[in-house]
Amino acid sequence: MQASQFSAQVLDWYDKYGRKTLPWQIDKTPYKVWLSEVMLQQTQVATVIPYFERFMARFPTVTDLANAPLDEVLHLWTGLGYYARARNLHKAAQQVATLHGGKFPETFEEVAALPGVGRSTAGAILSLSLGKHFPILDGNVKRVLARCYAVSGWPGKKEVENKLWSLSEQVTPAVGVERFNQAMMDLGAMICTRSKPKCSLCPLQNGCIAAANNSWSLYPGKKPKQTLPERTGYFLLLQHEDEVLLAQRPPSGLWGGLYCFPQFADEESLRQWLAQRQIAADNLTQLTAFRHTFSHFHLDIVPMWLPVSSFTGCMDEGNVLWYNLAQPPSVGLAAPVERLLQQLRTGAPV
């Protein structure tokens, strides 16, 4: 399919069926689009909308976000996952405040230099908010292009990604780029979906190689399968009345900056930790274990619950917090921690 025909058909479809009333599309600004694009990485639109609205209510400008404590940013992000996005968002806001006087940058080089912003995200920010001519290549766009032009191979491989970038550059029109880029994301999300694509409703069906051959399931190519390693983590749920001990993780790494239960490799090291602090372990109870899966490994979590009558022994340690179950503080929590806190709130650990 010729590039001009491709873009014309996509734009025509967008004018009739595309999404135009998402919260970040109303009174568009680079800040709003940036926030939405970061949230939409690895996350569905329906999930993102309430988070976006809460962020905008609390941080209406990039300066408000820059001035906020990281704990509060992580707290508002809790549940969205991939927490490095939130840490990078906060860092980038501080960079905008420091280097650009609080005004969101409007050149590709400056936007792409922000933490957590790559080529596609920078292109999306500038094209969607300011109409600047930059192609994009998020997961939805990769899928549409790979199927239409039968680009074989996993897009995580550099040569496959380069082919897709080349196609994106060719089909992105000089006029109407903001509509076109939004249309391509909408097509991938609404029509050219991972499974059960609605080919009969697609504006590209007359020129799509995968549709013609009924071979959509081959594109884009799958990531080579690998068996995820398994690890075990013992979580200590130390509870005094309505309060539970949490410790803040280091800024980088797994659950960076979030508050979690003290974690141990095995029960023996957990008991040693208690003994060093002269905390009796007589009532230590193992709760139901469960699995939490990261992108690169499985973590089998074994919660160990211990009610205590006092908590003076732990408060001299840095970055610890007695989390009040009845009046929860505004801090970022890892998803399994949130789950266990909810369990403790019911008053019946199992």
Question: What is each residue range found by the language model?
Answer:
Residues 2-4, 8-200, 204-217, 230, ...:
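Catalytic cores of DNA base-excision repair glycosylases
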Residues 1-20, 25-26, 189-350:
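Intrinsically disordered, low-complexity, charged terminal extensions of DNA damage-control enzymes
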